[in-house]
C-alpha cells in the first residue's frame, strides 16, 4: 500500500465541511478567549478570588461534560433523522433533550447553588479559596440550568447544518454579555 502525492487532492465535499466547521471552530476559539479575558479580570480582584475562580472552573469543566454530551449526541441524532426525512423525530429528540437538560440542570443547580463548597473542596483544603469558589459556583448555578437546555437546541441547529447562528449566539453571549458584565461588576467596591 503506497500513497503518492497525486492521491492527495481536494474533493467537492470540502467546502461543505468548511461551511459547517469554520463557524464552530471560530466560536470555540472566541469562547475560550472570552474565558481568558474573564480570568484576567478575576486576577485583578485578588489572589483569593483568582484561586476560587480557578477551582470553580475545574468544577465547571466536569459539569459542562453533561450538556456538551447532550449537544454532540443531539447534533448527530438530528442530522441522521433529517437526512432520513424524519424532521418530526428530530424535533421530538430536541424537546426530549431539553427535558433531560432541565432535569440535569436542576440537579446541578441544587449542588452548585446550595453546596458549591462540596465540589470545590475536592480541589483544595484552603477554606478561603473554597468559599470564593462556592460564591462563583452560586452565580454559575443559574447558567447551568440554561446551558443544559440551550445546548440541546444548539445540537438541533448543528444537526441541520446551521452552524452560523450557533456561532453568532456563542459570540454574542461571550462578548456582548459575559465579558462586559464581568468587567463592570469587577469595578464595584468589594467585588468577588
Each PLM stretch: what is its role?
Residues 1-22, 78-143, 186-192:
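Short alpha-helical transmembrane segments in multi-pass integral membrane proteins
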Residues 9-37, 41, 62-66, 70, ...:
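Hydrophobic faces of transmembrane alpha-helices in multi-pass small-molecule transporters and flippases
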Residues 27, 31, 35, 64, ...:
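Alpha-helical transmembrane segments of multipass membrane proteins
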Residues 53-116, 147-169:
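Small-residue-rich hydrophobic transmembrane alpha-helices
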Residues 24-27, 39, 76, 155, ...:
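Small-residue-mediated transmembrane helix hinge/kink sites in multi-pass secondary transporters
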Residues 4, 29-62, 80-81, 118-127, ...:
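Helix-terminus/linker motif at the lipid-water interface of multi-pass membrane proteins
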Residues 108-112, 165-191:
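Alpha-helical transmembrane segments of multi-pass membrane transporters
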